From Swiss-Prot:
Residue spans of biased composition, Acidic residues class: 179-194
Region of interest (Disordered), ranges: 1-40, 72-92, 133-158, 173-209, 306-347
InterPro entries: DUF4640
Basic and acidic residues bias locations: 143-154, 306-318
Basic residues bias spans: 319-330
Biased composition regions of type Polar residues, renumbered to the chain: 15-25, 195-209
Domain of life assignment: Eukaryota
Matching PANTHER family: CHROMOSOME 12 OPEN READING FRAME 71 (PTHR36462:SF1)
Protein name: Uncharacterized protein C12orf71 homolog
Biological source species: Bos taurus
Amino acid sequence: MAQELAAPLSCGQPPGQNITETTTDPWDEGDLRFEPSNSMVHSFSSSSESNLSLSVGYFPCEDTLSCEDTLSCEDSSSEGPSMHFVPPIQGSWRTENTGRLLARRDQIQDDPEQFCKLSITLAWDVDMASNNSDSTTNCDLSGDNKDKHPKEKTQLTLSKLDGLVQKLEKFLENQKDDKDDDSVFPESAQEEDSQLPSSSLPGMAQVSHQEYGSCQDLAKFNPLENEDVNQFPQIHPRLQNQELAKIISKATGSQGTDIAEISSVLPGPPEKEDTHSSTGALSCLNFRWVFRWLRPQVRSSLLGREDPREANERPRELARKKRFSYRSKRIQPQESFELGHPIPPDF
């Protein structure tokens, strides 16, 4: 067994290397000891590297750098910048390029930090571009952006307060206007209700006065029109008719009209009086009818004429009389014989 184990080690060794074996028992493997020298270790490593380079295209310089790069990046990102991975084989006997490897390691130590910084800034820029409002609110909540824009915040709060104050003022003004309208409207409604019955009937009397106010003597009857409405139901309608008949007889004394005839001509009183308004309306209608009947008579009495119907009939009678007079002036044939005038013969 000892010879078989020593055979592969002696394959790649140059001459001059000494291997000491101490075996007490050929079947005892625990007492096998090797004492390699420095030249032996160097030759073993060079032979292994040459075999790898010929078979796979492996170059030792690239291998050391690539392995160091990858392993150091992983270890620096996971464990921190203080922990560095160094292969045990290279760390034991590669001492020639220590300066170059240390410089390379320093560069690798700096690169992950720069990469992390770049990734953080890119992520921050994307976040700010996507949603500026959320980022600013998060900054404000975290307390990093407390005192950066105090003026803008105060302006926003002031504008909000102004808007609220304006809304409150408008609301209060609307309430005041509603209260004023409610307080004024009942008074005006009461005034209108009180004015309606008192102004309706005098208005009708005024209309009748305007219709029949062409004569000057009609002013004598105006006090009767302007009397209050409440006085109408107190006076009996028969008494009103008699008074009107007396006034008419006085105005037309020359014609000799009797009071009985005038009272018979006037319309009688209503049989049933329901309300004061109905009696007032009927009395106004009676006044209108009386004025229509009095108007031509008063005019004829003032102007010294008879009834207008008689005045219209006279021109017709005069025209007839004139016709008869013209006919009477014509010479008749009997008169011509008596006078002795010859009658011309008819051809």
